[in-house]
Swiss-Prot record:
Gene: argG
The protein's name in its UniProt record: Argininosuccinate synthase
CDD domains in the cross-refs: ASS
Subunit structure: Homotetramer.
GO CC terms in record: cytoplasm
Amino acid sequence: MKNEVKKVVLAYSGGLDTSIILKWLQDEYNCEVVTFTADIGQGEELEPARKKALSLGIKEENIFIKDLRDEFVKDYVFPMFRANAIYEGEYLLGTSIARPLIAKTQAQIALQTGADAVSHGATGKGNDQVRFELGYLAFNPDLKIIAPWREWDLNSREKLLAYAQKHGIDISKKKGKSPYSMDANLLHISYEGLVLEDPAHAPEEDMWRWSKSPKDAPNESEIIELDFQKGDLVAINGEKLSPAGLLTKLNELGCKHGIGRLDIVENRYVGMKSRGCYETPGGTILLKAHRALESITLDREAAHLKDELMPKYASLIYNGYWFSPERMMLQALIDESQIHANGRVKLELYKGNVMVIGRESANDSLFNAAYCTFEEDEVYNQKDAAGFIKLNALRFIIAGKNGRKF
């Protein structure tokens, strides 16, 4: 394939690893390289990536830096949260949900620039290689895919650094840069590697980059109100913001109160177990609020069906199948369930906790106090329950008459 590639679009962060990949592509494939850097709220200046690419010989017209923050939240994060998606009971899928958008945009740039190949910096051990490549092939099955970590012999940090020095790539460490392998976007930040590779070893406090420790969070709680329309967040404390602005605001509130830290061992799609630590402050608040709203607006059987389907939906995202027909089918069902998910949820934030203290919906609430009151009944006849119970017990009654023992 090396002699067949003419132009390749590289998912480029400007960091050491992808800068080495850039140079390696030039040397090994002797092809033109286009760089694509996505702003999905990782919190870093992206212009240095442009300068780094220029210094490595990339033409100005072959450097693409795109602000995808609103698209990321509106078209990926919000649809996922309509489903209350959680992988293996804890993980809010912060890395998983970002990959489809990056892959789609990268494939679009390939079409725009006439590139015949795409490349990424995911290793051959992880989930991201699957997520990226399923995305590429969904949009253009004719694209060639170059995954350097599956090809080269630079399989140690020492070899990578030696390669960088040999080719004049700056290896100086950014001031304050974490030694952990990290991934960040508007939804979360993740940490892997080093002492975290021992699942018995507790993470150091200085590893966490975003949030206060719950122990150091304010001693006074904070009350907030979130407004939803059709299952999507539209305002915080009455203030309407862009999708990215809303998640940014929730992150600020969550970080302030030590909310959203997570330390888990998860099952990767490729078959191994991996330990990761995550901070998802805004997402943790959003999930709690959305479920609270659904508790008054969603029919019982619809809610239970959603809960049954959610693990499958979450696994599809985790494993890289965002663009699959089965995920889209589930999304259509989920979105139908959100037609009446309109209302307001009141939350109290305090030292790592998110507590629901109120929920209301002016036109869509199914909660009717007249039916569930502990006071005198006016609309419900309690005698009706006897027949309901007898009919539901009919199979037990028949089995008992036949001598069946339980």
